[in-house]
Amino acid sequence: MYFSKELIKFTNIKHCFFSKNGGVSKNVYNSLNCGLGSKDKKENILNNLSIVSKKIGVDKNNLYTMIQTHSNKVVTINKNNQNIKRIYSDALITNIRNIAISVLTADCVPILIYEKINNVIACVHAGWRGAINGIVENTFNQMMQINKNNSFYVVVGPCISSKNYEVGKEFYNQFIYKNKKNEKFFTSNKNNKFYFNLREYVNLKITKFDIKF
């Protein structure tokens, strides 16, 4: 388990990042695979989710996961829908006590958000497709609908580095078409391709809300 210096100082919430280790899954899913949408054995996934629940000190029935689709959809869990079973979204928000919300990532960017004044938390799965289509903006906007007085604390978790994120011209053009200034997130290489800095692109989205992190 890994923790953020920014969030660990708050005693009324818990957070952490898990690595891929410490679970029961085998082969390509080795070992802490929590993806219910994967082709791993369901019993292994459920065992892994139980391990996670125990580690963070929450009942396994109160651990909410998403079926992530690289969308810009945000779901708020409240007293009216907290019995929901299958959540198709790429961000979760809640202010309900004693539940945990979670995000699964490999290369994509995990974002954890805490709104201190109203005790609202959120987690975001920001891949390139979700990011370019507004998953970050949608999450903050939806959080701000709960209350206008906001004090955000944001942590951007581990993700793919730009030196390992090689993309083609078509990918590059999608971002330039969206905004010419997006070219600063790309570095050309010798293969007529580009390296994309997903983390910095997501960071820019966050700072547009005047949030320092």
Task: Enumerate the language-model features and the residues they cover.
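Active-site microenvironment for binding and transforming phosphate-containing groups
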Residues: 1-213
